[in-house]
Design a protein with these regions (language model features):
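Alpha-helical transmembrane bundle of multi-pass membrane proteins
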Residues: 2-22, 29-286, 290, 296-538
């Protein structure tokens, strides 16, 4: 097989699909993963010339703007990490969920896998995502009509209020109200921030900039783990209040910073059609006066979008079918990797394996370190190696680690008694390997790819659908995991492993490469794809 292929998508399609008509055996699949990196560089070099390389450079202005916006990732990550930590604190369980605490401490007959099975406890975790589903659709209208900046600001304010109520909670009802407000904040932030980052970033560095959102999300999880580890040592039992209330710190930074964020040139053209103002902003963020080609593409995309004012009515059309499928499939698969199970319930999971409260929280901190480090690596290499290569390498890594964890637990963790220390630490290492695989692939890319595939006329609707689907399945997984763990026991890891295998095959066959392609010319990848070209016509 020759690696040097012409820079044409029809030959790209022939290479990938005509010569591989069936499902590949494992050796061929792995070989193609390795080949992908080599020929992608050649392919993308030609595509950059065909589709427009706007030039420009990374400026401090765009770096600081994107860093401020990406603080929203810390909010989301902190919430993911904090809920599982406080749910394993004895003082928190005694006050709000006494039945769970009694079952954990005194019921010797209950299975290891069922100690934390409580619908009320899962509502505490999952209610945030129910609110986020609704909020994401309201956020779409605000983003389209008023710009990305007001949506980010509204998300910060909602999160700030929710954090204060959570830290001051006196009963379960106050906890749930706080979680609902946090969900509104996260829904607004997740709908607008990835869009903001994609539109502000230079084309050749869009992957790195947008992956920064996942980096800050992982930093939020890590920060939450450190806070939980420290606050559970407070003897008087109010450490959980500190854990919940400290979410106000990044919320305050985001709210204050959003006041000074510039709007993107894309949003300025879409809302006001002020071409001169958009050109000045584009020159400022690109660090060059030669921005006319990029500006013309933005204007052309905006004109197409004004023909169809209601993007939610437009997105079901056949010509947008690939983007709609990805807006649903990518967040669906992302949640079924099982990563949020680790994020939400890692301390509970580690306690199930036999670790003490303090040790389980420390193990969660280390998991956060691994996740953050792997996401930083992804940020550095995603624009060089491409999205598809990282998706597949990370998918294989997650699949193998989950299968081995499932086998160990099936053989050595029974309904009663702790897992032997040697096996427990081995499972811990495998959890870290799984977290690293996610950090290289579905973590950052699950947010990056959806943020860059939508044409301007459907962009806000597409991101709203993506965020809503993400929240829906996050809610579903969070709400059902403890019951599934009780029912499936070790089989829960085979369940998620099967989904990882399916999603890796989905990426291999149906997701085209999106790297190094101007965001306003992304529609071409579907026209040149072996399958999606059947739906997309000029």
């Amino acid at each position: 097989m020759e690696l040097a292929i012409p820079y044409k998508y029809n030959l790209h399609r022939q290479y990938l699909y005509s010569q591989l008509p069936g499902i590949p055996d494992p050796l061929a699949f792995y070989k193609d993963c390795l080949l992908l990196v080599s020929w992608r560089r050649q392919l993308m070099a030609g595509l950059a010339n065909e589709r427009g390389d706007y030039g420009g450079k990374i400026t401090w202005f765009v770096v600081m703007s994107c860093m401020m916006a990406a603080v929203g990732g810390i909010l989301f990550g902190y919430d993911i990490g904090i809920s599982g930590g406080v749910s394993s604190m004895e003082s928190f369980l005694k006050k709000f969920f006494p039945s769970v605490y009694t079952k954990m401490e005194n019921d010797t007959k209950i299975s290891n896998y069922c100690k934390f099975d409580s619908q009320l406890l899962t509502v505490f975790t999952s209610s945030l995502y129910a609110a986020g589903i609704v909020a994401s659709f309201f956020a779409s209208s605000i983003t389209r009509s008023y710009g990305r900046k007001p949506t980010i600001l509204a998300g910060g304010i909602s999160f700030l209020v929710g954090s204060a109520i959570g830290g001051a909670a006196l009963d379960v009802y106050m906890l749930i109200i706080a979680r609902l407000l946090l969900g509104i904040g996260v829904g607004f932030a997740n709908q607008s921030i990835p869009l903001y980052l994609s539109e502000m970033a230079p084309m050749n560095y869009r992957g790195a900039f947008n992956t920064g959102y996942q980096v800050t999300l992982d930093l939020g999880i890590l920060f939450a783990g450190l806070v939980n580890y420290g606050s559970q040592k407070i003897k008087s039992g109010w450490g959980w209040r500190l854990s919940l209330a400290l979410a106000a710190a990044p919320a305050f930074v985001l709210t204050l910073g959003a006041l000074f964020l510039p709007d993107t040139p894309n949003s300025l053209i879409q809302r006001t059609n002020d071409q001169e103002k958009a050109k000045v902003m584009l020159q400022k963020i690109r660090g060059t006066i030669d921005v006319q080609e990029e500006l013309d593409d933005i204007i052309e995309a905006s004109r197409a979008s004004t023909v169809n004012e209601n993007s939610f009515k437009e997105i079901p059309r056949w010509k947008y079918r690939p983007q709609l499928v990805m807006a649903i499939a990518l967040p669906f698969f992302q949640q079924l990797t099982g990563i949020n199970v680790i994020g939400f319930y890692a301390p509970i999971l580690f306690r199930t394996l036999g670790f003490a409260e303090s040790a389980s929280l420390l193990s969660t901190v280390l998991s956060g370190v691994v996740g953050t480090a792997s996401t930083v690596i992804a940020m550095l290499v995603v624009d060089k190696f491409g999205r598809r290569a990282l998706f597949m390498f990370g998918g294989i890594q997650m699949l193998v680690s989950q299968l081995i964890i499932g086998i160990i637990l099936a053989l050595h963790l029974k309904d009663h008694g702790d897992l032997e220390k040697g096996y427990a630490y081995f499972v811990l290492v495998l959890v870290y390997i799984f977290a690293a695989g996610f950090g290289l692939s579905w973590g950052p890319l699950g947010w990056l790819v959806p943020s860059e595939i939508f044409q301007m006329e459907i962009r806000s609707a597409g991101m709203s659908i993506f965020v809503a689907v993400s929240f829906f399945f996050t809610f579903a997984v969070a709400q059902t995991f403890l019951a599934m763990l009780c029912s499936f026991k070790s089989g829960i890891f085979f369940f998620f492993g099967g989904w990882v295998a399916l999603m890796t095959a989905f990426v291999y066959w149906l997701l085209p490469e999106t790297g190094n392609i101007p965001i306003e010319k992304m529609d071409q990848i579907w026209k040149d794809h072996w399958f999606w070209s059947k739906f997309v016509v000029d």
